[in-house]
Regions:
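Acidic interaction surfaces
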Residues: 1-79
Length: 79
C-alpha cells in the first residue's frame, strides 16, 4: 500500500474511532461536544478531500501515535 493511501486509511480509522466515542455519549454530552464534533468532521473532510500532502506531512501523519484528527483540533483551538 502506498504511503499516501496509508495516510488516508489512518485518518479514516481515527475518524471512525472518534465517531464511536461520540456515539457512546449521552444526548446532553453530545450537545456539549457539538463544536468539537463539527470541527473534527470539518478537519476530516479537509484532510481527505482538499489537502495536498507533502512527503513531510505523510511522514508526520504515519508516525503520529494517537488520534491525528483530535491532535489537529487541539492545536487549532490552542492558537
Amino acid at each position: 500500500m502506498k504511503k499516501r493511501n496509508r495516510v488516508f486509511q489512518k485518518i479514516e480509522n481515527d475518524y471512525a474511532e472518534f465517531k464511536e466515542e461520540m456515539t457512546q455519549l449521552s444526548p446532553e454530552e453530545v450537545f456539549e461536544y457539538a463544536y468539537k464534533i463539527y470541527s473534527i468532521t470539518e478537519i476530516y473532510y479537509i484532510l481527505t478531500n482538499a489537502y495536498n500532502y507533502t512527503s513531510a506531512d505523510v511522514k508526520t501523519v504515519l508516525n503520529f501515535k494517537g488520534n491525528f484528527l483530535e491532535q489537529v483540533y487541539q492545536e487549532w483551538i490552542d492558537i
